[in-house]
Amino acid sequence: MLVVAEKEIAGLMTPEAAFEAIEAVFASMARRKAYNFPVVREAIGHEDALYGFKGGFDASALVLGLKAGGYWPNNQKHNLINHQSTVFLFDPDTGRVSAAVGGNLLTALRTAAASAVSIKYLAPKGAKVLGMIGAGHQSAFQMRAAANVHRFEKVIGWNPHPEMLSRLADTAAELGLPFEAVELDRLGAEADVIVSITSSFSPLLMNEHVKGPTHIAAMGTDTKGKQELDPALVARARIFTDEVAQSVSIGECQHAIAAGLIREDQVGELGAVVAGDDPGRGDAEVTIFDGTGVGLQDLAVAQAVVELAKHKGVAQEVEI
């Protein structure tokens, strides 16, 4: 078994490589060459933590495995980030474990890559202003990935804890973009593309906030009860997701479904847009990508890292 330590990931995986891997996975899913296993995601009743498993099998790339981990909101006292995970890959021919890969940075990179894929295919023409909702650990990755696929002129942002907005300001400066902190109503009115990446359990961006052609990448809702968007806003939009079954059960669409505002068959697959089987935005004023995060995304970036680690000689071989 090969082990690729968390400390090695930053020197191996780039945002560009993550984007390429995730875009390919979306297309494989649309062509039914790859599928995700049912998600296990539970509150464990200790440290307010959420823990679970996401896995899948990509028959076209012969990649099999799972990611184990979750969200520990009190990790700051341990000087650790809140998201903790490890990816395990298995030989699809024998079932033997083939690799264990640190999953923390990979999770941030693949989540950002997924929203960037949605921006590439669904952003309104002439989009100039990027709106960021949330300033946690993953927000910087999200902003960089968005800027990699679209030329924005300005970034505006909001966070429930304003003292954290310096992360967004610093990242925007790194990208050579001006940044302004704004309230949510102004963010919804001015941003052409909005990325939300929070752990909220109540709606933040309301229907009346959003004006004009807009694409929203809703990346924070991946558990029952979590919510970032007003269900009326979801109902107003043309909706795409990574996995429909997850979107309607643990994603942003769970609330609009429960309220009877949308049907499951109104939720499209982003992979179909990537594969050229769905026109995507069309004449919709608002599009939403409900990014629930799927195991296949984790496996794709982990497999890419393993190959890079072998090439650079930084993968450790162990017997178990």
Swiss-Prot record:
Residues engaged in binding NAD(+): 110, 137-138, 159, 199, 219-222, 226, 291
UniProt-listed Enzyme Commission number(s): 1.4.1.-
Listed under catalytic activity are: L-aspartate + NAD(+) = iminosuccinate + NADH + H(+)
User: Which Pfam families does this chain map to?
Assistant: OCD_Mu_crystall (PF02423)
Q: Does Nucleotide-binding count among this protein's keywords?
A: yes
Swiss-Prot/TrEMBL GO biological process terms? glycolate catabolic process; glyoxylate catabolic process
Gene3D superfamilies named in the record: NAD(P)-binding Rossmann-like Domain, ornithine cyclodeaminase, domain 1
- Gene Ontology cellular component list: cytoplasm
Could you state a single Gene Ontology molecular function term?
A: NADH binding
Residue numbers annotated as active site? 67 (proton donor/acceptor)
- What is its induction behaviour? Induced by glycolate.
Keyword Nucleotide-binding present in the record's keywords: the answer is yes
Which branch of life, at top level?
Bacteria
Q: What keywords appear on the UniProt entry?
A: NAD, Nucleotide-binding, Oxidoreductase
List, alphabetically, the SUPFAM superfamilies matched: NAD(P)-binding Rossmann-fold domains
Inactivation phenotype: Abolishes growth on glycolate or glyoxylate, but the deletion mutant strain is still able to grow on acetate, succinate or glucose with comparable growth rates as for the wild type.
UniProt miscellaneous comment: Iminosuccinate is a labile compound that spontaneously decays into free ammonia and oxaloacetate in solution.
Chain's role = Imine reductase that catalyzes the NADH-dependent reduction of iminosuccinate to L-aspartate. Is essential for the growth of P.denitrificans in the presence of glycolate and glyoxylate since it functions in glyoxylate assimilation via the beta-hydroxyaspartate cycle (BHAC). Thereby BhcD regenerates the amino group donor for the first step of the BHAC.
Question: Its family?
Answer: Belongs to the ornithine cyclodeaminase/mu-crystallin family. BhcD subfamily.
Q: What is this protein called?
A: Iminosuccinate reductase
The beginning of the lineage is: Bacteria, Pseudomonadati, Pseudomonadota, Alphaproteobacteria, Rhodobacterales
